[in-house]
Amino acid sequence: MSETSFDVIIIGSGPGGYVTAIRASQLGFKTAIIEKEDLGGVCLNWGCIPTKALLRSAEVYHNMQHAADYGLSASPQFDLKAIVARSRKIAGQLSGGIKHLMKKNKVTVIAGFATLKAGQDAPIVIVDGTDYTAKHVILATGARARSIPQAGLEPDGKFIWTAREAMVPDTMPKKLLVIGSGAIGMEFASFYDAFGADVTVVEMVDRILPAEDAEISKMARKAFEKRGLTIKTETQASVKAGAQGVTATLTSKGKSETAEFDRVILAVGIVGNVEDMGLEALGVKIDRSHITVDEYSFTGVKGLYAIGDVTTPPWLAHKASHEGIICIEKIAGGNPHPLDANAIPGCTYCHPQVASVGYTEAQAKEAGYDIKVGRFPFIGNGKAIALGEPEGLIKTIFDTKSGELLGAHMIGAEVTELIQGYTVAQKLETTEHELMETVFPHPTLSEMMHEAVLDAYDRTIHF
């Protein structure tokens, strides 16, 4: 093959793209990956990883402020510039790690913006005037923040921010408006609140974290309001930037109020990066800025596939990675199981953390299941008390007939690390009896996972 001819070309190097490239190389494909910015995509450079670095700084600062609770003394101060610099350093370090992985796995990296035109086996990929050919082309172009210009909800890089601007603030805003209460919105609300900003969160529907179980959402709201956040649900926002800040009009149930804010963060969803690549001319089906694909990520256009945020929800990094592996293994002639969207865990890294997998209680009932529900509070767990984290809940949902674990929902310290236990249990179709008979180590937070199963069958021990 020539330097412009490959077995597989992947466009986009986020967690969908680079993972797929590595697996393609492992399967023996001559592979290239095309990236217009930094290796690692939005997730690694401007999303998942750097936000966790910021939130870690917020967590440490919060703990220092409460040092007396642990028999310690501290007079903490924060250096915003240093906090941001640490986050950026980590992103840069990991992007460099992806570069190393590409070299190690003999993946050719091509820098630039890719467009497509019709080809023989698959679309021809054009970068900076050079044609690249492959038998299979995989789109992993990701997504960007959604804007609503008619309501003034359009980033200006100064007063009205997307997540990217919110990650690199020059100063800490005194008053901050966060529009949207999904994972992105609540993580930034948690970060800025920790460092003293007066944060207001606006959500159109009747509860924050609307994708989560209603009971967990209610507990999250209570915890955030206890920390001092103002939360307005069933509220729409329109904003107008001025010389020194933003005037927001907040409307709920026909009544409007105006308020002034230093900054606004838009967290009202995402749109797929599908523009200016020539997809429409190829006949790619696009629904509301996201590409329609089948269970193996095939677009319907010969040799063309799409994975990750540019396709259908849930829009999660780990879903993109897994989709990519399924896609390339299918291309290689394997018979991988299609991805079960209901078995993908979701995590929100605010304080308190929120995590879930499977059906919510309402969804399970709507699906026609007769269910048993178990609950166990953090206050009943010795490790949680020792950590100084007594607020939280683990909730389980079982099918009464089969004993199948239908869903699990958590709020509290480190639940984003606990949820995978239930995810594995779901994948292995573990029954309630098998979970109840499993030995959990003591003292750990994971014991609550056991107790939440026991509670569904009236056998809980410690509460």
Please describe what each predicted stretch is.
Residues 156-172, 258-333:
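FAD-site-proximal beta/loop scaffold in flavoenzymes
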Residues 9-37, 49, 53-60, 332-333, ...:
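Flexible, glycine-rich terminal cap/loop adjacent to redox cofactors
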